[in-house]
A protein has these predicted regions:
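Gly/Ser/Thr-rich phosphate-binding loop
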Residues: 221, 246-251, 260-327, 340, ...
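Conserved AMP-binding A3 loop
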Residues: 34-37, 160-187
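Conserved beta-loop-beta connector loops within the AMP-binding
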Residues: 338-362, 381-382, 399-400, 462-466, ...
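Conserved AMP-binding/adenylate-forming core of the ANL superfamily
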Residues: 2-10, 14, 24-67, 71-75, ...
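Structural core segment of the AMP-binding/adenylate-forming
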Residues: 14, 51-52, 79-141, 153, ...
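AMP-binding/adenylate-forming catalytic core of the ANL superfamily
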Residues: 70, 91, 108-110, 241, ...
């Protein structure tokens, strides 16, 4: 078989399927498939989709959890040359409509238990022609499709997937990855990792349409096995890490905290574990140190955004070392060899700030967007004339090149003329052993205009007072930065569909009835 088109996700996955035909490619619960079996299912779905009058380059919306059928979709769209548009299960209907309409999706593939969400908005989507519901008839229909590879010829610059930003302010923005940029992102994720070998196992506790998906393709290309779970549960994850001899996985800090603090973590063996990749949110020092004690030197931290990823990375050797003039434990790592990172003047983004000065983080890497999908105004706002992506994050670089992320540009609190970054306070609060979640935001104040307030979730059975936490922040950061109020809640903090804490949701009730609020807050 000879299929032209250069280095694409599809051509490389096809090659790996051929060379690893009898190895295990995927496992979900008690089901598992070899590479040959998984590829054949992908080919069948590709032919099914092409028979629905779709053509390469068309966009296909997808609403699903991790499952064997999710892998069918990943492979089937790649083989057919279709562009996946993953939807988020926690999205409101209006977000589904926006994501499907502005990408002109002609078809949606949806798991049966989410079908109502798509059927309810079908009439609002004039371009949408077909909804493929994966119900009890799916398997029979799939098996009836041809298993002859359509051998669609693709170019490395053809679009592969459109992921959407978290949408914490305004509508989510579409970020399109070409085959080339998706492969580059996967390569750069694995640059610092111990080499993955055929037969190694990568566990996906989050959807492969989210952050964990960056590890899916490299695992397949290396001849490894992707193990999928449809939801995260700490004890079950620990048992799977041990029994499946997992080598690699992606976690957000809250998940790592739950794993490290679970009694089972000290009872089980994780001898094959090589990498616990942490990302998506700041991690508390105590959590990182405890996880290292429990799991060993397997923690890796990365920094990037949907728009450009990864840019920074740090392995355990650096993360937990002492470096004169730097605090690696508090940093997001150092710039990868194949990327550039600069601190730009927030008011004049063409100007680079001096080392040690804070400003907007600007990034440039192979795995970045060329612009937002169908949104030239947002593209112009977020991309510089020399090709850098403006992240909206405020940070600084020290003399050794370590990046410290201070906060989101739009979340800055201005209290009595002083600039206060919520993330700095959140990190301090999270370093208290009783606090497992923290969010800081502005509330109105008659004297100062606005002041920081914090909402915290405590570990089970933990006790700490508002006074203690306020004193901790004053001691660590200075009195003018301390929160004036700390609110405790028993339920998890509100999060966006991609897992980011929504400060806006916590902040808004405090501003109800106010005639104005400070810009950006």
């Amino acid at each position: 078989m000879a299929v032209g088109g250069g280095l694409t996700v599809t051509s490389l996955m096809r090659q790996s399927a051929r060379y690893n035909a009898h190895r295990l490619a995927v496992r979900f619960k008690h089901q598992q498939l070899t590479y040959a079996q998984a590829w054949q299912r992908g080919v069948k779905l590709a032919n099914w989709l092409l028979a629905l009058n779709l053509k390469p380059g068309d966009r296909v919306g997808v609403l699903e959890d991790n499952s064997l059928e999710a892998q069918d979709c990943f492979l089937g769209c790649a083989i057919a040359g279709l562009v996946r548009v993953p939807l988020y299960a926690r999205n409101a209907a209006a977000s589904h409509v926006h994501m499907l309409s502005h990408t002109d999706c002609r078809l949606v593939i949806v798991a049966a238990h989410y079908a109502d969400e798509i059927e309810q908005i079908f009439d609002q989507l004039p371009v949408l022609e077909t909804v493929l519901i994966r119900d009890e008839t799916y398997e029979q229909q799939l098996m009836a499709c041809s298993d002859k590879d359509p051998e669609v010829i693709l170019d490395p610059e053809d679009w592969f997937v459109i992921r959407h930003t978290g949408g914490t302010t305004g509508n989510p923005k579409g970020v399109a990855y070409s085959h080339r940029s998706w492969l580059a992102a996967g390569r750069d994720w694995f640059y610092h990792f111990p080499p993955m070998e055929a037969g190694d196992v990568c566990l996906h506790v989050g959807p492969i349409s989210h952050g964990s998906g960056y590890l899916y393709t490299p695992t397949w290309l290396a001849g490894g096995m992707n193990v999928l779970v449809d939801h995260f549960e700490a004890e079950a994850t620990l048992e799977l890490l041990s029994s499946a001899q997992v080598g690699y996985l992606f976690l957000v800090p809250a998940m790592l905290s739950m794993l490290a603090r679970h009694p089972k973590a000290r009872e089980l063996s994780f001898e094959r574990l090589k990498v616990m990749q942490i990302g998506g949110a700041p991690i508390a020092d105590d959590t990182a140190l405890l996880a290292r004690e429990v799991f060993g030197d397997v923690l890796y931290q990365g920094y990037g955004q949907t728009e450009a990823v990864p840019v920074c990375m740090m392995g355990p050797k650096e993360w937990f070392s002492e470096v004169e003039g730097s605090k690696p434990l508090r940093s997001a790592g150092r710039t990868l060899p194949f990327a550039r990172l600069e601190i730009r003047d927030p008011d004049a983004p063409e100007i680079e700030m001096a080392l040690g000065e804070s400003g907007e983080i600007a990034i440039l890497c192979d795995g970045q967007m060329t612009g937002f999908w169908n949104n030239p105004a947002a593209t112009e706002e977020r991309m510089t004339s020399d090709g850098f992506v403006l992240t909206g994050d405020i940070g600084r670089l020290d003399a050794n090149g370590y990046l410290y992320v201070l906060d989101r540009k739009d979340d800055m609190i201005i209290s009595g003329g002083y600039n206060i970054w919520p993330a700095e306070l959140e990190n301090t609060l999270l370093n208290h052993p009783a606090v497992i979640e923290a969010a800081v935001y502005a509330i109105p104040d008659v004297k100062w205009g606005e002041t920081p307030a914090a909402s915290c979730v405590l570990a089970e059975g933990a006790v700490v007072s508002e006074t203690e936490l306020i004193a901790l922040c004053a001691r660590e950061l200075g009195s003018y930065k301390k929160p004036t109020s700390v609110f405790f809640q028993k339920t998890p903090l509100p999060k966006s569909p991609v897992g980011k804490i929504q400060r806006k949701t916590l902040r808004e009730p405090h501003w109800a009835g106010q005639s104005r609020r400070v810009a950006g807050n």
